[in-house]
From Swiss-Prot:
Substrate binds at residue 152. The active site is at residue 164. Gene3D superfamilies: NAD(P)-binding Rossmann-like Domain (3.40.50.720). The gene is novJ. GO terms for biological process: fatty acid elongation; novobiocin biosynthetic process. This is Short-chain reductase protein NovJ. Belongs to the short-chain dehydrogenases/reductases (SDR) family. Keywords: Antibiotic biosynthesis, NADP, Oxidoreductase. One of its GO terms (molecular function) is oxidoreductase activity, acting on the CH-OH group of donors, NAD or NADP as acceptor.
Length: 262
């Protein structure tokens, strides 16, 4: 059994550690990759294509960090297996996995087609499962690791997002169950549920609503106790906290970072 003293010596955020972040080409994923690199980790930047990873990789390297971009569609099992194999071959291990890849296809259920439903679940939930499976096997052999998934406050229910809310709600259950399975092997599994955050998705939402970015953010801020929306950097800071060795007693939880949304 691991003692409290042993827990503080686990490999997590350190200059010898390696993190893999999916959906890291923009938004929260990019901010997370850059923050982990700033903490001294080598970061495997994963997005749908290698080209999508280049801006984040360049930002990390410009700041003096270590990064490698890998193109991978998390909806394809073979692509995930290949990406993880490449990462392990090049870096030797993966200490932190951040499952940040996600999409939305918002539409009321009664007007939603099978493809819009299936695609959202396959990327958000299926991608989390595939990456956790591939990386979790390596972490189990290592005897340590952090898996950090992304749920959302939308899991509580949000009109026009039955597909997205279902996927994000399922991730919370997936997280708690996987934590029980991997805990005996020194691997913690947690999820982060952001509220409304200023990312490129805001522009996409504004376009769908026929409004502008500022008006969408202003309206969203009204539902927050702190009177504003969040930033990708604030979510990234939470990822770093969960990834730290000192957080080894935290597992199976979904951490809400939503500015006090009711």
């Amino acid at each position: 059994m691991t003692s409290p003293a042993d827990a503080t010596t686990e490999v997590a955020v350190s200059q010898e550690s390696v993190a893999m972040v999916t959906g890291a080409g923009r938004g929260i994923g990019a901010a997370t990759a850059e923050r982990l690199a700033a903490e001294g980790m080598a970061v495997i930047v994963v997005d749908r294509t290698e080209q999508d990873t280049r801006a984040t990789v360049a930002a990390i390297r410009t700041a003096g960090g270590r990064a490698r971009g890998i193109g991978c569609d998390v909806a394809v099992a073979q692509a995930v297996t290949a990406a993880v194999a490449t990462a392990v071959e090049e870096f030797g291990r993966i200490d932190v996995l951040v499952n940040c890849a996600g999409i939305n296809r918002d539409r009321l259920l009664l007007t939603m087609g099978d493809q819009e439903w299936d695609t959202v679940l396959d990327v958000n939930l299926g991608g989390t499962m595939r990456c956790s499976f591939a990386v979790g096997r390596h972490m189990r052999r290592q005897g340590h690791g952090r898996i950090i998934n992304f749920s959302s406050v939308a899991a509580r229910g949000n009109a026009g997002q039955t597909n997205y809310a279902t996927a994000k709600g399922a991730i919370a259950g997936f997280t708690r169950t996987l934590a029980a399975e991997l805990g005996p092997h020194g691997v913690t599994v947690n999820a982060i549920a952001p509220g409304f955050v200023a990312t490129p998705m805001v522009d996409e939402l504004a376009e769908r609503l026929g409004g502008d970015r500022d008006s969408v953010m202003s309206e969203a801020a009204k539902s927050s106790a702190v009177g504003r929306i969040g930033t990708p950097e604030e979510i990234a800071a939470t990822v770093v906290f969960v990834a730290r060795p000192e957080s080894g007693y935290l597992t199976g939880e979904t951490v809400h970072v939503d500015g006090g949304r009711p």
